[in-house]
Amino acid sequence: MSKVVLGDKHIQELSTNKIIDLMESGLNMKFSAEQIAILNNDFTKPLLVNACAGSGKTTIFILMALIAIAKGNAEPNEILGITFSHKSKLDMGERYAKFVSELSDIGLNFSNGKPKFTTFHALFYQLLLQNPEYRSSKVLSSYRFFVRDLADQIKHPSNIITKDEMLAEMFDLNDYLINQGLTSDGVLPDSADGNLSTAIKLMAKYSRQSHGDEFYSDYVDVLNKYQDLKRQNSYIDFNDMKLLLLESMQTPEYLQYYQRIMSRFKIAVIDEFQDIDNLQWEIISKLLSPETLAHLIVIGDDDQSIYSFRGSNPKYILNYKRLLPNAQKHNLSTNYRTGEKILQKVIPLIKKNHVRLEKNLLAAKKDKGKFILYSTKKSGFSGDSKMLRHLVKQINDPKINNNDIAILVRYNSSRMLLADWLANQEIYADINNASAILQNNIVYRIITELMKAMWQDKYKYFSNQANRIGFRSYKNHTEKVESSADDKFNKLSKYLKAADDYNASTNTPYKRHDERVKVYFNSIQRFKTKISETDDEQKAAKLSKTMIKDLYKAATKLTDRYFDYMEEKNFMSKNEVNDIKKYLEEELGQYKNIDDFFFDEEHKKEILSDRMKQGKQEHRIQFLSLHQAKGLEFKYVYLYGLTDKEVDRHSLALNMWFPPEMAMDKYIKKWKLVYKEHYKFLEEALKAAHINDYRDITNNNAFNPINLDKTLNKDKEFKIFHNLYQEIENFSAIVEEERRLLYVGVTRAQQELNIRIAPDSNPLVFELNLPKKKKQTKK
């Protein structure tokens, strides 16, 4: 074994505390009591480092690795560090090299080599390549490489969302099934035993969206086609890296081979342990040697577990002591990132979570930080808000680097409108998500494409949105008109003429839709003629302004039924639809020429879609979702668009009454009490949470709410009640994850946190320690 030397002495001869003192001196750091306790780990038992946001998780891992090397517990290349992102992996490598270099300056010389820092995906892929069957495989980063072929498998298009959106929801569901270990074939839940109807019921339960059976039938066809395309082209995706590796591990010789490769690692550390999923744990716990597993180190923060929608499972960090017997737990309670005046605001919020590991939350930056609260009586987007004026002022301040400012949002719709508004001020946001660009939004596209269809006399735009005028049946009607005329129309006017002929010879209920379109189209075309014929500029401008209003009105009137249906079925938020419509109407009101509007919109979209072009702009801004922001930090943070879409004041009560992991007997006792004293509010809460199973109880005469114990002695009624219990527990867990999301957002801020509250704000915002309103003194 190579030695770590200090001058002409072997450092192994020194005590751990002496080595820690040397490292403090060489790295110019002062370690806290909590850090010193962790660094004194003797590598004989499993260890959980429960590290709060901003506590220096990467730093403590690298220091632990260096001490293990210095004490002779392991060579550098016998240490394995696993994380979830490529960025974190690079950060580990850079931090290790930096510390080794700085320590060499004081004569503390480490042997050559370094630990293996890797992501789960990279590690699994490297092992899979040892299998001859997969050596020629290529990595497929996204299903979108085959998007056209996959879209063709959708035989039951939705009246509500596009095929592209259907595919996104199908693959989100597939990720969840795989990461939770619910499927071994990568398509159907194993517990369905190949029975499609059973599988559909199970998938409907796992999906966060509401779909009919036809969606799940198409899901099966899409995923089977996807598997075929990957096989034909020798591709494996990130999920395959787990599924195929686990499958090959069922063969003893492969499992033993993989274990021999992994046996070189005497020390293993898993970072961001709160993000691990069932499959990753199953694989890594089988690959590591029993000796290494016996002192496995995991670092994470249960308060930052925010990826359950893709299958991450916080139960591993929450139950680590049960997972690995004799496990120790040490906390890192000090946040070195966020100023105390900001951190103190979020502590009451995160402590309201019922399921969390207890730890103190302390700020290293005492009496620092600025928490700015903006209050408004108006819901929705407002370009005239004080917070946005403050944001623009900071962006334009030459003393502030734009890279130090970030806007964090919960929903894409919030990101869209603000990013577009900023682009109008020539401030361009790095949105990191094409679907969050307003011009790509479905509500925006529906309205503007119908406006283009009527103004430019373009059939293709009308055809794109025909199903939003009269749903799928009207779209089918337009295709029949095309077929009967034997014409792929270029102009909307040609379609309307052909529709007149078709409707005259057939008894079709869709004649009324065609006539409505024709009335609006003819009105707009008359305006167009008048504008082109007048020589009076003022009159032309006045006509043009009126025409723009009528054009917008025509597009919205034609699609009213569609949007009403979407909102009623909870496929779209009424507030979001209204916000986009209102924003679009206000923006159109600033134009005298509709062609200028269409041109400017394309120009904005071009810049917002192209990072190269964004880089050439004078002002840019980081625009991230709360999920994307995890692991990052900024001097100035704006939390924007925290609406009550996911949790409202009614549904929040379910978490208070029925916290996650509540035992069934306690749940029954609580249900009786709540039902008796708060029945109306309980009903509103269940409706707001979209928990519809409660109707099975209220509509069932066999249920006696007064004598519930007797009712639950019946098998059928108990099963119904237990299903409701599970649905409420799932929703209560969602509420706690939403708290964690808000906690993550607040703790991204170093110096200043800006937050806006409005009538439609998420009620969790009010769990922050918000500044009290100053009382007016009577004169």
What is the predicted role of each segment?
Residues S111, P132-D221, Q274, K329, ...:
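ATP-hydrolysis module of ASCE/P-loop NTPase motor domains
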Residues A65, A423-N424, A434-K475:
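Conserved short internal alpha-helix adjacent to the catalytic or cofactor-binding core
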